[in-house]
Amino acid sequence: IITGGIDLSVGCTYAITGIVVASCTVTYGMNPILAIIVGILIGAVLGAFNGFLINKLKLQPFIATLGTMSLYRGIAYVVTGGVPVTNVPESYRNIFNGELFAGVRSYIVVMVVVFVIAHIILSKMRSGDYLYAIGGNEEAAKLSGVNVIKTKYVAYIFCGICAAIAGMIMLASLGSAEATAGQA
């Protein structure tokens, strides 16, 4: 939203990531850390696809992400057949849902780390200034030398990664993933 755009597909990115990571750990017996890396990559790819539609095909962010919301939800239904993926191994669940110290769960630490990274980017780095500049006036930002396309790509990729992390945390909390996850 800072860049003057919007991503309506975050709930579906959240769902697809949970489904893929659950399938990797349950069906294929993948190592949980490797499954998390796959989940982050899924979020980045889905975010990059949104960035492609908006930057290269010049679609309005609302329309592009409304379309990818439907596309990603459809993929989630096709992959699962509408049936939740259950029985996620404890080894995965403990990564995001385990207690670290004094009752603090690991997902709290993950949330704080993501918040700190976002805060540093937005308030301490030039790229954060670029994000605000694009949201304020994209044409003026472009004339000021900001690489608008690259910056918007990175914003959508970061958004996808954040949605993926949320999906993986919810998977750890619930122990299952389904195509309807992330719906309002």
Regions inferred by a protein language model and the residue ranges of each:
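Single transmembrane alpha-helix segments in multi-pass membrane proteins
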Residues: 1-28, 52-59
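Hydrophobic alpha-helical segments embedded in the membrane of multi-pass proteins
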Residues: 12, 16, 45-48, 112-116, ...
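Hydrophobic alpha-helical transmembrane segments
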Residues: 12-16, 33-41, 63, 108-113, ...
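Membrane-interface helix caps of multi-pass small-molecule transporters
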Residues: 23, 28, 45-57, 75-79, ...
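Alpha-helical transmembrane segments within multi-pass membrane transporters and channels
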Residues: 29-69
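Transmembrane helix-bundle core of multi-pass membrane transporters
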Residues: 57, 61-127, 151-154, 173-182
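Transmembrane alpha-helices
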Residues: 63, 147-171
